[in-house]
């Protein structure tokens, strides 16, 4: 699996240490193992997880501004766990409402010795952001409108919303609440993944 991961990283132009690669592989192995009992992801094949979960998460790392992030609706830690491995200087709060997912995240934190994540079981709309976050990240979480409605209290004054999407959601972008604007749209290159991937970066309008 290490050779497969190294090849994917090379194709994506991403440079990681051997320790980071081993952490990512350990996470995939845990996800594969726990998935049998906990049904954490529909992806069953570990090699497919490397593409659809690991690479699909870490390609957004260069676009994240700040040091404190919250991954809302993280599920089994996507994209938060892979991002925490490739951005060890940043801190990631991993938020999910299901206890079984958070139990898995805590086990990952323990086994991989990740001191820059905080798994939390909570609904996003009632979670207090103290202090506010630099970035709110979502992957397959909700529409842009719902994301902004549920997460509006989470970022600080200069914070950003980072929404990982497949095809560019032009209808969702067109119907954004007037309090927000799209700062940038990045077309992502994920080696081995068919279909389009986009990162939509949104910021509050300052009147």
UniProtKB/Swiss-Prot annotation:
This is Ribosomal RNA small subunit methyltransferase G. It comes from the Bacteria. Belongs to the methyltransferase superfamily. RNA methyltransferase RsmG family. Pfam families: GidB (PF02527). HAMAP family: 16SrRNA_methyltr_G. Specifically methylates the N7 position of guanine in position 527 of 16S rRNA. Keywords: Cytoplasm, Methyltransferase, rRNA processing, S-adenosyl-L-methionine, Transferase. It is found in: Cytoplasm. It is an enzyme of class 2 (transferase). InterPro entries: rRNA_ssu_MeTfrase_G, SAM-dependent_MTases_sf. One of its GO terms (molecular function) is rRNA (guanine-N7-)-methyltransferase activity. It catalyses: guanosine(527) in 16S rRNA + S-adenosyl-L-methionine = N(7)-methylguanosine(527) in 16S rRNA + S-adenosyl-L-homocysteine.
